[in-house]
């Protein structure tokens, strides 16, 4: 049990490594910001469509058949999008980055910091939700077969490094504090060992493929919405459009290679 929990903790703390990479730079240039956010978009879109959502389809079709399970996965996916969209609309206009400003530069700087803060917190929340069932899955793999669990944990750790960057970059820009940015990045990853512990104590006797599949589908929807509504527009608005797109492609490539390494 300690071995399984240790593997899960290792994978979760990798977000802190990503945060450390993001805050190690002395200044955050527009190019670095655009590239990092674009990279994060690539990571989140690829992992959502290639790993999380197909996993939801597999879980749900195994219970409700091809048609019923597919419908459930699609509903869960768009349900996740609707949930985060509603939360976004409930944010007061004064701090909502989607509301245009009619005031000058000082307010624009204030709105930029608010946008970055909101983006970082929402990204941390989405990653934490994603890491919760992921941690439980890593823990179960560690309990069942250590030879399978080790490459799974390493692959998840590789995934978590760019996710830590996704959290730390906007929060460093918003707060000006490397310590806070690194703390949030690390905290989002600690959802992984928390998922392992809570899952072992409470969920394991009750959770079934239906709940797990719907959870995966909704998390994929949340991550896609954040990517296209928050991360990508901010990356492009930096004025470094091509840098953002190159970062996006690089993020997808890193995720693809990390998945292929452990097939």
Curated annotation (Swiss-Prot):
Keyword match Ion transport: yes
Catalysed reactions listed for this entry: Zn(2+)(in) = Zn(2+)(out)
Membrane topology label: Multi-pass membrane protein
Residues that, per the record, bind Fe(2+): 131, 134, 160, 163, 192
Matching Pfam families: Zip (PF02535)
UniProt KW Ribonucleoprotein keyword: no
Alphabetized UniProt keyword annotations: Cell membrane, Ion transport, Iron, Membrane, Metal-binding, Transmembrane, Transmembrane helix, Transport, Zinc, Zinc transport
GO molecular function, one term: metal ion binding
Predominant subcellular localization, coarse grouping: membrane
InterPro entries, A to Z: ZIP, Zn_transptr_ZupT
Domain of life: Bacteria
Subcellular location: Cell membrane
PANTHER family: ZINC TRANSPORTER ZUPT, ZINC/IRON TRANSPORTER
Job description of the protein: Mediates zinc uptake. May also transport other divalent cations.
Name assigned to this protein: Zinc transporter ZupT
């Amino acid at each position: 049990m300690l071995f399984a929990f240790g593997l899960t903790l290792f994978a979760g703390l990798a977000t802190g490594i990503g945060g450390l990479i993001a805050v190690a730079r002395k200044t955050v240039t527009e190019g670095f910001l655009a590239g990092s956010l674009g990279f994060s978009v690539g990571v989140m879109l690829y992992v959502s469509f290639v790993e999380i959502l197909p996993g939801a389809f597999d879980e749900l079709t195994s219970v409700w058949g091809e048609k019923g399970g597919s419908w459930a996965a699609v509903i869960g996916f768009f349900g996740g999008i609707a949930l985060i969209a509603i939360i976004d609309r409930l944010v007061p206009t004064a701090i909502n980055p989607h509301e245009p400003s009619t005031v000058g530069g000082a307010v624009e700087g204030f709105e930029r910091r608010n946008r970055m803060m909101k983006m970082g917190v929402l990204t941390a929340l989405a990653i934490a939700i994603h890491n919760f069932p992921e941690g439980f899955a890593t823990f179960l793999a560690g309990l069942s077969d250590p030879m399978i669990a080790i490459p799974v944990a390493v692959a998840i750790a590789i995934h978590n490094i760019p996710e830590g960057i996704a959290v730390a970059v906007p929060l460093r820009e918003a707060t000006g504090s490397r310590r806070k940015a690194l703390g949030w990045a690390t905290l989002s990853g600690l959802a992984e060992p928390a998922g392992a512990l809570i899952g072992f104590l409470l969920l394991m006797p009750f959770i079934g493929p239906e709940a797990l599949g719907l959870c995966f589908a909704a998390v994929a929807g949340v991550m896609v919405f954040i990517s296209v509504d928050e991360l990508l527009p901010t990356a492009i608005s930096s004025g470094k459009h091509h840098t953002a797109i190159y970062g996006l492609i690089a993020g997808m490539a890193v995720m693809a290679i990390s998945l292929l390494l452990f097939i």
